[in-house]
Amino acid sequence: MRFGLNIDHIVTLREVRKTYEPEILEALFIAKNTHKVDLITIHLREDRRHIQNEDVLRLLEISPLPINIECSINAAITDFLCSLKNKPSKVTIVPENRNEVTTEGGLDCSLKGLEEVIRAYHNKGIEVSLFIDPLKDALHFAREHQVKQVEFHTGVYANLHNALYSNANNQIHAISALKDKSPKELKEELHNAFLQLRRMSKEAFFMGITACAGHGLNYTNVKELLKIPSLRELNIGHSVVSKAVLVGLEKAILEMAQLIKR
């Protein structure tokens, strides 16, 4: 299983104070020196709430690890990434809503302009991945447009697992739609969400598409996904950075790697 470390929220801490620390390149080399991280993931959002254009340039220039850039189909971002001298190892196209706290679901594959953006990256020799819900129609869209990799949105699975097996439902930011569900309901919905991820990962494999997954994964809910042999990569960020605040980035990375690289 490949471990993609998302370092967005290291930069979030920097941007809160509009200062120079924490240094994104220091985080990059801490990750690299663990010898457990396979790629670095960043999300270049339209509102630049964390990662900035300059971060992209610096990372691509110096990174010894592959860089996966998440972004919307925004024309300015597409033009910027296509113009780069140092190319990312892949671009993962994600849905984006400026009012969202974090990505809320998979990509709408009927989105106007999506096909043109995929073509633009392919024309520059940049691999494209699509951040999608685990649905067969989305996989067929990927195959039809020569997209060789997808990342399944695991938010539904992760939220259900957290509600059932942690104290998430008793926290200040508990998800209201899950608070009133019984443990039996949560368990059934979680099982169905897991089965859907497993089915679609297998479907992707038979289509010749590499299946990755990410969103909301943490040190508890990630373990079950290791039972899906067709999954090849997990992208994890917030939970690792959250733990790093308490125990340090190196230790946080190593603890996650110990779980997913068994």
Curated annotation (Swiss-Prot):
GO terms for molecular function: pyridoxine 5'-phosphate synthase activity. Its main location: cytoplasm. The active site is at residues 43, 70, 215. One of its GO terms (biological process) is pyridoxine biosynthetic process. It is found in: Cytoplasm. It comes from the Bacteria. It catalyses: 3-amino-2-oxopropyl phosphate + 1-deoxy-D-xylulose 5-phosphate = pyridoxine 5'-phosphate + phosphate + 2 H2O + H(+). GO terms for cellular component: cytosol. CDD domains: PNPsynthase. Keywords: Cytoplasm, Pyridoxine biosynthesis, Transferase. Its EC number is 2.6.99.2. It is an enzyme of class 2 (transferase). 1-deoxy-D-xylulose 5-phosphate binds at residues 8-9, 45, 50, 102. InterPro entries: Aldolase_TIM, PyrdxlP_synth_PdxJ, Pyridoxine-5'_phos_synth. The record marks 151 as: Transition state stabilizer. Gene3D superfamilies: Aldolase class I. 3-amino-2-oxopropyl phosphate binds at residues 6, 17, 216, 237-238. Pathway: Cofactor biosynthesis; pyridoxine 5'-phosphate biosynthesis; pyridoxine 5'-phosphate from D-erythrose 4-phosphate: step 5/5. SUPFAM superfamilies: Pyridoxine 5'-phosphate synthase (SSF63892). Belongs to the PNP synthase family. NCBIfam families: pdxJ (TIGR00559), PRK05265.1-3 (NF003625), PRK05265.1-5 (NF003627). Homooctamer; tetramer of dimers. Catalyzes the complicated ring closure reaction between the two acyclic compounds 1-deoxy-D-xylulose-5-phosphate (DXP) and 3-amino-2-oxopropyl phosphate (1-amino-acetone-3-phosphate or AAP) to form pyridoxine 5'-phosphate (PNP) and inorganic phosphate. This is Pyridoxine 5'-phosphate synthase. It comes from Helicobacter pylori (strain G27). The lineage of its organism: Bacteria, Pseudomonadati, Campylobacterota, Epsilonproteobacteria, Campylobacterales.
